[in-house]
Design a protein with these regions (language model features):
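Conserved catalytic neighborhood of penicillin-recognizing serine enzymes
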Residues: 11-30, 126-181, 229, 240-241
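A short, well-structured edge-of-sheet supersecondary motif
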Residues: 2-5, 64-94, 183-188, 237-240
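Active-site SXXK
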Residues: 50, 79, 98-132, 160, ...
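Non-catalytic, structured segments within soluble enzyme domains
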Residues: 1-44, 48, 186, 190-197, ...
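Surface-exposed patches in mature extracellular/periplasmic domains of secreted proteins
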Residues: 37-39, 59-71, 129, 193-198, ...
Length: 241
């Protein structure tokens, strides 16, 4: 009978929690797309590796009271986002862990230096082996210092960039022009650098501005595509449905 067949069926196993993969991206999609069905460009294998990496470094940085970090990975040839880790410990309600750090403006620090080198290389006003001065300077009262608090004299441009030296970067920006560099940064999509160039001044190259990891990573991907002579196109998070 139906009853006998029913009671002979084994009981289902206890339900398990569904895996949480890219929860910050899922939350973003939910807010921006109102729950509409979406297919992301995320590579599950890479995403899992990135989340494990973020968890491991979160434990390491936690000893220095650093509670938030994010990782964004873009595949240059396809220009698709393959990993999106907006923060760590999504399930925690404290310490800002539910903030998607990828979308949150942060001080640019030294991360804009490669864009200045790129812009000057592209126009031919800089060569990789060109010697740059790393000496004490005073520009209208602005006296930049290197992190080491030391001076190297004359340094090849490639080495100055690799070592993230501040003084060569400032003198290069002075030569290139703050308004011109400010315009270039806006052209490559750094939308949060939205005040006048005079507001930032030469400190623009030393962390005097804010940008999101999303915009900065997309700009680096643009630079990579340019160097590989690939056509420029917008970075994608979604696959066709």
């Amino acid at each position: 009978s139906t009853y006998e067949l029913a009671i002979s069926e084994p009981l289902p196993d206890e339900p398990h929690a569904l895996p949480q993969i890219a929860p910050y991206l899922v939350s973003r999609f939910y807010q921006e797309r109102n729950g509409e069905y979406s297919r992301s460009t995320i590579n599950k294998g890479i995403q899992t590796q990135v989340e494990d990496l973020a968890e491991r470094w979160s434990n390491e940085f936690g000893r220095s009271d650093i509670r938030n970090l994010a990782i964004l990975v873009i595949d240059i040839p396809s220009n698709q986002v393959v990993a999106y880790c907006g923060n760590v410990h999504f399930d925690r309600k404290q310490g800002g862990n539910q903030v998607d750090v990828i979308q949150a403006p942060r001080s640019t620090g030294s991360i804009l230096k490669p864009f200045l080198y790129y812009a000057m290389l592209q126009e031919g006003s800089l060569l990789p082996d060109m010697l740059l001065p790393d000496v004490p300077v005073n520009i209208n009262g602005f006296t930049p210092q290197n992190f080491s608090m030391q001076f190297e004299g004359a340094v090849p441009a490639s080495e100055a960039l690799a070592r993230s030296l501040n003084i060569p970067a400032v003198t290069m920006l002075q030569r290139y022009g703050v308004p011109k560099f400010h315009s270039f940064l806006q052209q490559i999509g750094l939308k949060t650098i939205n005040r006048s160039s005079s507001h930032y001044g030469l400190s623009l190259i030393l962390g005097g501005a804010e940008a999101t990891l999303w915009d900065v990573t997309n700009a680096y991907a643009m630079m990579g595509r340019s160097l590989l002579q690939l056509p420029q196109r917008s970075c994608s998070l979604l696959l066709p449905t």
